[in-house]
């Protein structure tokens, strides 16, 4: 059988900014989860429209439900002290979340669970509720009002929001256990994506997603993961030359910008 010409075509790399609008399709989230299973010792169970991935210790489960797309969270990560115990913490992914956020979350979860499972499941060794983030004040503004705190992008399209469990603010999504919420909702598009974390989620998991979202640099992505057309008018895309044509001695003028020196913001509880 002849080779598929699409398989022989080299994939391009592109820079997308701002990175919080570099949306990805839920089907790509499932593809990423498939790759995750292939590269780890986690087990997978496939249903008619679902993919459930379970850690070797059976205490962490990741469920992707294609039928939930557009109606609520289509990927849910949950932790229990054992298979029969009540849920200890939960992370929910809805909409066109940038695949880099999903990859960072899965990679951090798997790596930390392999080295320090009690930290992931029980929070042992972590300072509860403490998260230190570094942001570019030219790209994000800090706020602390009406029982909520966090950061909002200067264009108003995205936010990272903290709601303590004892806050007077209304519960996020009607769930008082949700303490962190990251979302993008451009005015011309409406709800684009969101990720929420409940109270006992290990801070390092939130940090992996928040740091990716707040990073002011463009995101580097392969065209293997296409950008949904709905956000095309809202982002800037720069196509990079193939690796064989890129200079090796010095970076090109149009290459990825250097990471700016991080600027410290107050610790947020």
Residues of each region from the PLM?
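Compositionally biased accessory segments in Actinobacterial proteins
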Residues: 1-269
């Amino acid at each position: 059988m002849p080779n598929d010409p699409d398989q022989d075509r080299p994939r391009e790399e592109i820079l997308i900014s701002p990175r919080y609008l570099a949306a990805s399709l839920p089907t790509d989230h499932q593809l990423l989860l498939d790759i995750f299973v292939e590269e780890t010792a986690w087990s997978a169970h496939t249903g008619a429209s679902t993919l459930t991935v379970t850690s070797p210790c059976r205490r962490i489960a990741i469920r992707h439900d294609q039928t939930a797309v557009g109606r609520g969270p289509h990927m849910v990560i949950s932790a229990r002290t054992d298979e029969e115990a009540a849920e200890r913490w939960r992370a929910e992914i809805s909409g066109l979340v940038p695949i880099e956020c999903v990859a960072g979350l899965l990679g951090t979860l798997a790596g930390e669970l392999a080295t320090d499972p009690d930290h992931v499941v029980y929070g042992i060794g972590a300072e509860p509720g403490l998260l230190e983030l570094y942001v570019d004040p030219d790209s994000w503004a800090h706020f602390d009002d009406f029982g909520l705190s966090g950061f909002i992008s200067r264009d108003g399209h995205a936010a990272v929001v903290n709601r303590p469990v004892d806050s007077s603010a209304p519960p996020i999504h009607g769930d008082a256990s949700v303490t962190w919420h990251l979302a993008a909702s451009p005015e011309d598009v409406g709800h684009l994506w969101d990720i929420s974390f409940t109270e006992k989620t290990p801070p390092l998991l939130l940090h992996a997603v928040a740091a990716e979202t707040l990073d002011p640099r463009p995101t580097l992505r392969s065209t293997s993961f296409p950008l949904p057309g709905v956000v095309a008018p809202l982002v800037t895309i720069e196509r990079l030359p193939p690796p064989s044509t890129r200079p090796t001695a010095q970076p090109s003028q149009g290459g990825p910008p250097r990471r700016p020196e991080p600027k410290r913001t107050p610790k947020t509880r």
